Amino acid sequence: MQTVEPGSWRAGKTSSSARGYDYQWQKLRAAHLKAHPHCVFCLRDLGMVGWPPEAVVIECALRGVREPVGTIGDHIVPHRGDDQLRLDPDNVQTLCKPHHDGEKAMNERRL
């Protein structure tokens, strides 16, 4: 179970909605994932950064590798309660759960 550090912007915010993951965020996340369905870290690892989704699907089939579908709309810069960052469509990237919980989490702990 994750704990919230004293003084954190999340202290006392027990629901996901109170932490900024409300209807506005859900709409932004859904639109982003529809337009950008692939994990950006997986694309980086496969050498396919910037490729259109259709080309990624075809190339993965040709290479015989799993399509790098992402399910998480992740804030590039942690919003820490800042609504401008939280709802900025340019501050969202698609990640798969392993990259979100692994590499991204490790990078954020360093901040």
What are these regions (language model features)?
Residues D82-H99:
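Short beta-strand-alpha-helix junction that forms the catalytic/metal-binding core
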Residues M1, V40, Q93, K97:
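Cys/His/Pro-rich metal-binding microdomains
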Residues M1-A31, L43-V69, G81, A105, ...:
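A boundary/linker detector
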Residues Q26-H36, L85-D88:
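Short, flexible, mixed-charge glycine/proline-rich loop motifs
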Residues P37, D101-K104:
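Generic structural signal for secondary-structure transition and capping sites
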Residues C39-F41, I72-R80:
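Histidine-centered catalytic micro-motifs used for acid/base chemistry in nuclease
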Residues H75, H99-H100:
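Histidine-centered divalent metal-coordination motifs
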